Amino acid sequence: MPTINQLIRIGREDQKKRTKSPALKACPQRRGVCTRVMTFTPKKPNSALRKVARVRLTTGIEVTAYIPGEGHNLQEHNVVLIRGGRVKDLPGVRYHIIRGTLDTLGVDKRRKGRSKYGAKRPKA
């Protein structure tokens, strides 16, 4: 415990805020190349085969990113755009792939929440 005199002389050191998505390096999105496309099983009590991809970013860092929506066209060597945002039931997955940009197609026949899945407006 410091004395009041020590606090006046030196003061307290600010606690540094840790980022939740360090691979983005303070950018909103980053481009990368898929090195592997695979499925993970979620934590208890959930059960599914969640689609994920290993992505080597332009910064040289390799991360695991979630592929949202039903169905995807991603393969190895596809160029993708990733954003921050973790998947609660997949440990270690802290990034999302943005649908409808670069080599990633939007979700087909999506009616609601289209902007989140890169789906075009359906013909009336």
UniProtKB/Swiss-Prot annotation:
The record's gene field reads rpsL
The protein depicted here goes by the name Small ribosomal subunit protein uS12
Q: Which domain of life is it from?
A: Bacteria
Record's family? Belongs to the universal ribosomal protein uS12 family.
Any single GO BP term: response to antibiotic
Q: Which residues cross the membrane?
A: none
Q: Which UniProt keywords apply?
A: Antibiotic resistance, Methylation, Ribonucleoprotein, Ribosomal protein, RNA-binding, rRNA-binding, tRNA-binding
User: What is the stated purpose of this protein?
Assistant: With S4 and S5 plays an important role in translational accuracy.
UniProt KW NAD keyword? no
List the Pfam families hit by this protein, alphabetically.
Ribosom_S12_S23 (PF00164)
Question: How is this protein organized at the quaternary level?
Answer: Part of the 30S ribosomal subunit. Contacts proteins S8 and S17. May interact with IF1 in the 30S initiation complex.
| Additional notes on this entry | The streptomycin sensitive allele is dominant to the resistant allele in L.biflexa.
Alphabetized SUPFAM superfamilies for the sequence: Nucleic acid-binding proteins
Q: Tell me which residues bear 3-methylthioaspartic acid.
A: D89
* CDD domains attached to this UniProt entry: Ribosomal_S12
Q: Which organism is it from?
A: Leptospira biflexa serovar Patoc (strain Patoc 1 / ATCC 23582 / Paris)
Q: Which GO terms describe its molecular function?
A: rRNA binding; structural constituent of ribosome; tRNA binding
Q: Does the keyword rRNA-binding apply?
A: yes
Q: Name one GO cellular component term.
A: small ribosomal subunit
